[in-house]
């Protein structure tokens, strides 16, 4: 399923994002002078299952989770520098059931262990001066079946 997600908005997913699903967020531009840009994967109860906060000013990409109205957990960080290489950056999230695998421009950055065991029902995108286009495209599908033996 393909969606268009505008900055400072969210999309409700037609089907839950759950184990064995892949979400790819693609931008038509990369604004290297952009500021903090955030993507949140939210449950139907508005818990933030996966928070991806791209912070160029801190040279960090922060991952976290929290229940609606609850406190943030401990941050997990990776360096920002060099994560987005092309003019059309992408973020891919694979749901492995017990953890998320997050890739930037098709390179794995982190495996983030799920802290809240729910499915995502929405994805939010926020920024004051986004690194990415508005809208971005969000493509959600299941994992491809294994290839037959050669």
From Swiss-Prot:
Galectin domain ranges (all copies):
9-141
Alphabetical UniProt keywords: Cell wall, Extracellular matrix, Fruiting body, Lectin, Membrane, Secreted
This entry's Gene Ontology molecular function terms read: lactose binding
Which GO biological-process labels does this protein carry? sporocarp development
Pfam families, from UniProt?
Gal-bind_lectin
- Binding of a carbohydrate, residues: 51, 55, 64, 75
InterPro entries hit by this protein: ConA-like_dom_sf, Galectin_CRD
Q: Which PROSITE patterns match?
A: GALECTIN (PS51304)
Subcellular compartments: Secreted, Extracellular space, Extracellular matrix; Secreted, Cell wall; Endomembrane system
Give the matching SMART domains.
Answer: GLECT
What triggers or suppresses the expression of this protein? Repressed by continuous light.
Listed GO CC annotations: cytoplasmic vesicle; endomembrane system; extracellular matrix; extracellular region; fungal-type cell wall; membrane
Q: Which domain of life is it from?
A: Eukaryota
Q: Describe tissue expression.
A: Most abundant in fruiting bodies. Very low levels of expression in asexual vegetative mycelia.
Question: What is the stated purpose of this protein?
Answer: Binds lactose. May play a role in fruiting body formation.
Describe, as the record does, how this protein assembles with itself and its partners: Homotetramer. Oligomerization is required for carbohydrate binding.
Name of the protein described by the UniProt record: Galectin-1
**Source organism of the structure:** Coprinopsis cinerea (Inky cap fungus)
Taxonomic lineage from the root: Eukaryota, Fungi, Dikarya, Basidiomycota, Agaricomycotina
């Amino acid at each position: 399923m393909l969606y268009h997600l505008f900055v400072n908005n969210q999309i409700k997913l037609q089907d839950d994002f759950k184990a064995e699903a892949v979400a790819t967020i693609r931008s038509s531009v990369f604004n290297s002078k952009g500021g903090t840009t955030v993507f949140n994967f939210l449950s139907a109860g508005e818990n933030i299952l996966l928070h991806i906060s791209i912070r160029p000013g801190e040279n960090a990409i922060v991952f976290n989770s929290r229940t609606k109205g609850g406190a943030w957990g401990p941050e997990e960080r990776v360096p920002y520098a060099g994560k987005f290489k092309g003019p059309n950056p992408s973020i891919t999230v694979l749901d492995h059931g017990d953890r998320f695998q997050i890739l930037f421009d098709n390179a794995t950055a982190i495996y983030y262990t799920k802290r809240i065991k729910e499915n995502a029902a929405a994805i939010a995108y926020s920024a004051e001066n986004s690194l990415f286009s508005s809208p971005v495209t969000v493509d959600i599908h299941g994992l491809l079946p294994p290839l037959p033996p050669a």
